[in-house]
Design a protein with these regions (language model features):
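Non-transmembrane, membrane-proximal soluble domains of secreted or membrane proteins
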Residues: 1-166
Length: 166
């Protein structure tokens, strides 16, 4: 499971399946200003604030799945190519198990996760520590610069070795 939450602007950025890759696991549109502050949770556990309504948008990139939290009486299919959703409001602080309630293949048994419902203060502390899409882009730009420097240095060293042997 992976999760994306709206950032400070309160709006999720738009996404497209064609944008999904290792550098953009959620497929967020790079040109959408609302996506820059989206909070990215690449973990099996999502934290939620108690007594706040939550709208879950579900999508799948491979096969049919089902996000199920028995204690919330919440169960919804995640269908490839379709966004499904439902609303709920967690009202009891605690930890709850997320299950995939749709047989989805050989890895089905491992499709477990968690929901941690927290007080407002704990949730705000947790959310402030999470990575945003803007942070992810910045990290990738730094890595690209470092890779270019390494490639340039390796090319220089390689040329130096070639000239040395002649």
């Amino acid at each position: 499971w992976q999760y994306r939450l709206p950032g400070e602007d309160g709006k999720l950025g738009t996404t497209q399946i064609i944008n999904i890759n290792d550098n953009n696991p959620f497929g967020i549109n790079l040109d959408d200003p609302y996506g820059k502050d989206d909070v990215l949770i690449q973990s099996d556990v999502i934290n939620l604030e108690t007594n706040q309504p939550v709208k879950i948008l579900l999508r799948s990139v491979d096969v049919l799945h089902n996000w199920y939290v028995p204690q919330f009486r919440a169960k919804m299919d995640a269908v490839p190519g379709i966004v499904t959703y439902y609303w709920f409001e967690p009202n009891k602080i605690g930890e709850y198990e997320v299950l995939c309630a749709e047989y989805c293949g050989v890895g089905h048994y491992a499709m477990r996760g968690g929901v941690e419902v927290q007080s407002t203060e704990d949730y705000k502390n947790w959310i402030s520590e999470q990575e945003t899409f803007k942070d992810l882009i910045a990290k990738q730009e730094i890595l690209e610069l470092e890779n270019k420097k390494l490639a340039k240095n390796n090319n220089f060293l390689l040329r130096k070795e070639i000239y040395k042997e002649e």
